Amino acid sequence: MLAGCASQPSQTTPEGTVDTSDITCQEAVQPEQRVDLEMIDTLMGKGRNHAALARLESKPMDGIDYWLRYGQLLASTGKLDDAEQVFRELVLQCVDGRSRHGLGMVQLKRNHVNAALLHLEIARNLSPASAQVRNDYGYALLLAGRYQQAAFELRTALELANGQGPVRQNVAVAYLLRGDEQGLDALKSDYGFSEDELDYARALRQQFGKSEQ
């Protein structure tokens, strides 16, 4: 396969597989490519994942940015086998933390926590300054019962994300599971963590320790 060759994403076959033979690891750098990706990201941000997938499938798949979104959208629309196939091929061909992250998240959706941790740890090492990767790795560590390590990863993600997003709840859950009152106080003083958020974190805490390893 020649890197940089544009191709349309293949239709899913009756066996439920996708053709990944034209995967390329190059970044999408052309202005029209960036416009395409921004439009797809906007749909994803609104939760319109089926529409985003349809839009993506109408575009040439001429860069890793397209394939990463393709795998993510396949997973978010319930096509986990196809998503896993895309991400595994990306991992084989591209040394990229985002590919490992995607594969780890597919494993997490399957409730395969240990398999997810393997890939998310590699993603974390490849992309140490990614708040999303550190958050998702920390969340998987919570599911595995590794609360101290999870708290470190999630606090790092919180700081990288400037205190915004779902990591707020995750780090609070980690502190609750560890009985870390000092950490909870820091969330209140440093990041304006409210009592309502704390109550919600207490409710979320009940789900941990129940995942199959």
PLM feature segments, named:
Residues 45-51, 76-88, 110-122, 145-153, ...:
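Structural signature of tandem alpha-helical TPR/SEL1-like repeats
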Residues 33, 64-67, 97-98, 131-132, ...:
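Helix-start (N-cap) detector for alpha-helical repeat units in TPR-like alpha-solenoids
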Residues 6-9:
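Bacterial signal peptide processing site
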Residues 69, 102-103, 136, 170:
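Canonical tetratricopeptide repeat
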Residues 58-62, 92-94, 125-126, 159-161, ...:
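Structural marker of alpha-solenoid helical repeat scaffolds
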Residues 155-198:
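TPR/TPR-like (Sel1-like) alpha-helical repeat modules
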Residues 2-4:
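C-terminal motif of bacterial Sec signal peptides marking the signal peptidase cleavage site
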